């Protein structure tokens, strides 16, 4: 199951209209599916269910940022480069110390970190839920669409590390490997 994001980071999870449905779906998926992948807000929501709450930012974290693989031998990270890049578009993050504590307590495996974006890819210890706070699925056109939308709001900085005049999707290999390896991981769990 893949659950995507929603622009509701500013709300407490319990204030989101569909929170109860989200919890029910993720509980059912945990029992019926090999793995659930939560992207952006869904990743934050899964982290919250694992015991780590988000911190809301004053300004949007927006752009294409470097990440470092923390677990090169992991089934999902082993094919990634040691360092790779991924789009981010969010108004929240997870506190590093709380994430590290959750790993020490055996709740999470931390898989990728960026100095500007924090822990971005992680999973539950039982590997049933994978969280990615970024947007590996984004295309150049999607980022440009967000730039244009945000210009109308006037309060969002332009994206970092992104050239609007380039059609280069420099995170394509990360995206393709992530989804390929996740699907392969799911297949191996059920075969």
Task: Name each region found by the language model.
Residues 3-74:
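Cysteine-nucleophile active-site neighborhood
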Residues 69-191:
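Amide-donor transfer/coupling interface in amidating biosynthetic enzymes
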């Amino acid at each position: 199951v893949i659950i995507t994001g929603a622009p509701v980071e500013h709300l407490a999870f319990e204030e989101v209209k569909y929170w109860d449905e989200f919890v029910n779906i993720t509980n059912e998926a945990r029992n019926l599916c090999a793995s659930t992948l939560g992207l952006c807000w869904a990743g934050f929501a899964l982290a919250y269910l694992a015991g780590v709450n988000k911190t809301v930012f004053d300004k949007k974290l927006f752009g294409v940022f470097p990440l470092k693989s923390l677990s090169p031998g992991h089934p999902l990270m082993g094919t990634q480069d040691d360092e790779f890049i991924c789009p981010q578009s969010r108004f929240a993050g997870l506190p590093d110390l709380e994430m590290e504590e959750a790993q020490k307590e055996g709740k999470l495996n931390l898989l990728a970190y960026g100095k500007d974006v924090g822990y971005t890819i992680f999973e539950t210890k039982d590997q049933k839920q994978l969280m990615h706070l970024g947007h590996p699925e984004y295309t150049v056109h999607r980022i440009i669409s967000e730039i244009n939308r945000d210009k109308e709001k006037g309060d969002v900085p332009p994206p970092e590390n992104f050239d609007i005049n380039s059609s280069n999707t420099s995170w394509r290999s990360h995206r393709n490997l992530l989804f390929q390896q996740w699907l392969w991981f799911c297949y191996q769990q059920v075969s």
